[in-house]
């Protein structure tokens, strides 16, 4: 499977909100009985690159999608629960799929909850969502229940000091990181006067 994201070695300085470091967080997640992980925050903050690191560091073969037509197919979920090939289900840009059911427009959540319940009996199979949602109140509370959800991780822009530390770790050319208050990870690797690269999804769709 081809996985996109920043073509850079991942450094802990990219994600200062992991107090024990990125790799320790991933190890704790895969050692946990909880199977759901939610990565939320604005575009450009490194969610896809973090996913890429999870897959590569844990040697994971994932089913990855963002396509509602695929997700509405019950066989897609059955295959994930029963096959021995895939050990992670990743739903990218899952904003509309994560909305509270009481809002009335989300018929996918019941499927996700059923799959999560099924995974409790299957070790080493995980379900990861990425979303640009900025508030956890916009995600169905049942998905975030302790025991089901390992963590909801907010991805944010870096402060100027954090950006400088991340740039130093990555070996980037010196810049005035204090020229603006915050930096997205995407802007960190963007050359001056270069347009921000278009986002590419990881998964398969239409």
Residue ranges and their predicted role:
Residues 56-66:
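Post-Walker A helix-loop "phosphate-sensing" segment adjacent to the P-loop in P-loop NTPases
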Residues 3-32:
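N-terminal pre-Walker A segment at the start of P-loop NTPase domains
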Residues 49-53, 57:
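Active-site signature of alpha/beta-hydrolase-fold catalytic machinery across serine-
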Residues 142, 148-206:
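C-terminal alpha-helical "lid" subdomain
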Residues 74-123:
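Conserved nucleotide-sensing/catalytic segment adjacent to the nucleotide-binding pocket
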Residues 32-50:
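Walker A/P-loop nucleotide-binding motif
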Residues 117-143, 150-152:
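Canonical AAA+ ATPase core
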Residues 64-71, 96:
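A short hydrophobic beta-strand->loop->alpha-helix junction that borders the nucleotide-binding pocket
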């Amino acid at each position: 499977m081809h996985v996109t994201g920043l073509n850079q070695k991942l450094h802990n300085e990219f994600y200062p909100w992991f107090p024990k470091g990125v790799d320790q967080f991933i190890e704790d997640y895969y050692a946990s009985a909880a199977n759901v992980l939610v990565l939320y925050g604005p575009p450009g903050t490194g969610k896809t690159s973090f996913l890429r690191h999870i897959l590569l560091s844990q040697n994971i073969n994932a089913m990855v999608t963002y396509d509602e037509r695929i997700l509405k197919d019950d066989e897609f979920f059955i295959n994930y629960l029963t096959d021995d090939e895939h050990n992670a289900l990743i739903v990218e840009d899952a904003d509309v799929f994560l909305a509270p059911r009481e809002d009335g427009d989300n018929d996918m959540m019941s499927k996700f909850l059923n799959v999560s319940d099924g995974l409790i009996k299957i070790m080493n199979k995980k379900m990861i969502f990425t979303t640009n949602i900025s508030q956890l109140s916009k995600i169905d509370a049942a998905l975030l229940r302790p025991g089901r959800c390992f963590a909801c991780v907010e991805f944010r822009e870096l402060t100027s000091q954090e950006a400088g530390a991340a740039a130093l770790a990555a070996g980037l050319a010196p810049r005035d990181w204090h020229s603006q208050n915050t930096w997205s990870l995407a802007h960190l690797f963007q050359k001056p006067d270069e347009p921000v690269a278009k986002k590419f999804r990881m998964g398969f769709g239409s």
